[in-house]
Amino acid sequence: MAAQVDAVILAGGMARRMGGNDKGLVELLNRPMIEHAIERIKPQVKEILINANRNQNRYSEFGFKVFSDQDSGYLGPLAGMITAMSNTDAEYLLVVPCDCPLLPTDLVARMLAKLTAEDAELAVASDGKREQPVVMLLKPSLRESMKAFLDAGERKIDFWYAKHHYVVAEFSDQPNAFVNVNTPEQKQQLGEAIANEENH
């Protein structure tokens, strides 16, 4: 039987470098950024959850469950992840950011294969050059470990997952897969890259 995988799209950040605009709702090629991520992820998972701390009515229009961080202090991505772990009964949870419009269409398959082959607790994606800490596949049972980490005042994702048996899933064959948008300039460059991809 195929493993059950749910996904959470993290849209809870402050997006200071985008002028404070809600990154998931910033338009790229006339569509909200998160819509690109949803399109890529939806065929790969059972359910999609959206973690958003503002504009929740707008996010709910996409037809998926929307939730805010249990702790309202903007503790970074881990706060959204730990809340998502409480909102899924799937065997695995895929975590992706809302501003990666070129996510691999085989993301879950490759991460799950790597994780199960090495009997790991979580898999982290890599573009071949560096790990992508907010693109991971993990077991929701790791929630208690993450809670203890946050309770100790820690915030950095890579510090947390380094405490566990994790594997790195390489996507060097898709170098743009995890390109994200932090500035208006990056948004323009990415829009041009996607348009080029669609024209070939």
From Swiss-Prot:
Its EC number is 2.7.7.77. InterPro entries: MobA-like_NTP_Trfase, Molybde_CF_guanTrfase, Nucleotide-diphossugar_trans. The keyword DNA damage does not apply. It is found in: Cytoplasm. Mg(2+) binds at residue 99. Keywords: Cytoplasm, GTP-binding, Magnesium, Metal-binding, Molybdenum cofactor biosynthesis, Nucleotide-binding, Transferase. It catalyses: Mo-molybdopterin + GTP + H(+) = Mo-molybdopterin guanine dinucleotide + diphosphate. CDD domains: MobA. GO terms for cellular component: cytoplasm. GO terms for biological process: bis(molybdopterin guanine dinucleotide)molybdenum biosynthetic process. GTP binds at residues 10-12, 23, 51, 69, 99. GO terms for molecular function: GTP binding; metal ion binding; molybdenum cofactor guanylyltransferase activity. It is an enzyme of class 2 (transferase). Transmembrane segments: none annotated. SUPFAM superfamilies: Nucleotide-diphospho-sugar transferases. Transfers a GMP moiety from GTP to Mo-molybdopterin (Mo-MPT) cofactor (Moco or molybdenum cofactor) to form Mo-molybdopterin guanine dinucleotide (Mo-MGD) cofactor. Monomer. The N-terminal domain determines nucleotide recognition and specific binding, while the C-terminal domain determines the specific binding to the target protein. This is Molybdenum cofactor guanylyltransferase. It comes from Shewanella pealeana (strain ATCC 700345 / ANG-SQ1).
